[in-house]
Regions:
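Beta-loop-alpha module in the N-terminal Rossmann-like domain of NAD(P)-dependent dehydrogenases
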Residues: 2-62
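Short loop/edge segments at beta-strand edges and connector loops
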Residues: 6, 45, 72, 156-159, ...
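Rossmann-like NAD(P)(H) cofactor-binding subdomain of soluble oxidoreductases
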Residues: 28, 48, 71-78
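Rossmann-fold dehydrogenase core element
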Residues: 58-76, 96-99
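NAD(P)-dinucleotide binding in Rossmann-like oxidoreductases
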Residues: 165-170, 180-194
Length: 194
């Protein structure tokens, strides 16, 4: 029988789990994961691991201090077409990969608008708005890293706030990447597509 509660920290203390899956609002991921690590739990974190570089460093330090496992859950890896594409690229079945492109284009108004059928207020909180690059564009980047199997050595990007004008943060991104093996990549992310 599953334990339930309305206070995350009280629930951790009461249940004393071995593993915690963090899948709440993006801006809470790091704090909830750190609390679980401090209580001796391994942690699986729905992407993104953190929304700031400082929080990402805190997670790495806590993992090293505790020796517990911390893992990002990139859900696109569970999708059969992605898996097959990556296997084919890595096996050379599609020839030598010299360029890769990944897009993450969504009409997020169902999530952003109070009238939306999937409205999630935390995504448009002006103090902690969801970063669509971290919250969605990471699928394209993770799939590229998985398929190309080479670190990124250089990246540049641009963003604007034009595709979803009422959203409180940038909503359109383009990144250009160079991998250490010479492969080039491009990622396009937008949250106001309809």
């Amino acid at each position: 029988e599953a334990a339930i509660g309305t206070d995350y920290y009280e629930l951790l203390d009461r249940v004393e789990p071995n593993l915690v899956f963090v899948a709440g609002p993006d801006h809470l991921h790091a704090e909830q994961a750190l609390s679980a690590l401090d209580r001796g739990c391994h942690v699986l974190i729905e992407k993104p691991l953190a929304t700031t570089v400082e929080d990402a460093h805190r997670l790495v330090e806590a993992q090293q201090r505790t020796g517990l496992q911390v893992m990002a859950d990139h859900t696109a890896r569970y999708l059969y077409p992605y898996h097959e594409m990556v296997l084919a690229a890595r096996a050379g079945e599609i020839g030598q990969v010299f360029f890769t492109q990944g897009d993450y284009l969504h009409d997020m108004w169902a999530h952003y608008s109070p009238q939306g059928d999937r409205h999630t207020p935390w995504r448009i909180d002006s103090d902690n708005p969801q970063n669509i690059l971290l919250g969605g564009g990471c699928h394209a980047l993770d799939t590229m890293l998985w398929a190309i199997n080479s670190p990124v050595e250089e990246v540049y990007g641009y963003s604007n706030k034009m595709s979803a004008p009422d959203f409180p943060a940038d909503d359109c991104y383009i990144l250009v990447l160079r991998f250490t093996n010479g492969v080039l990549g491009k990622i396009f992310v937008a949250s106001g597509c309809s």
